Amino acid sequence: MTVVRGKEEAVVAAIRRLTREKRQMGEKVGIICAKETWGCYEADYVEAVGSKGDELAAAQHLYAVLRSFDSRHVTCIYSEAFTGQGIGQAVMNRLLKAAGYHILEAEKTGGKEL
């Protein structure tokens, strides 16, 4: 799993490109995102965990989404970063642990995986 952070446009572009590359390699890709960007992605599974700024909804849905991806044998997961304040900090901590602290800075890397 990789958490992608940065400006929304750069994050979406990076996840879209990385998803295409992984799917061409035969990977089954899942994406965790906000409701507002859900329609921007094409992957095997795209799950919106809530609206931007609604960290409570993200916290409530995150575990179910991760379990769902696991049961579907998703081999590669990309997640948009969430705000790191309040409940959002707990969501980000869980995402970072699941990602093994693998973070991609969309703008700095041109969307290339670190």
Language-model-derived ranges and their functions:
Residues T2-G100:
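A C-terminal functional module that forms or caps the active site or interfaces directly
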Residues K97-L114:
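A glycine-rich helix N-cap at a beta->alpha junction
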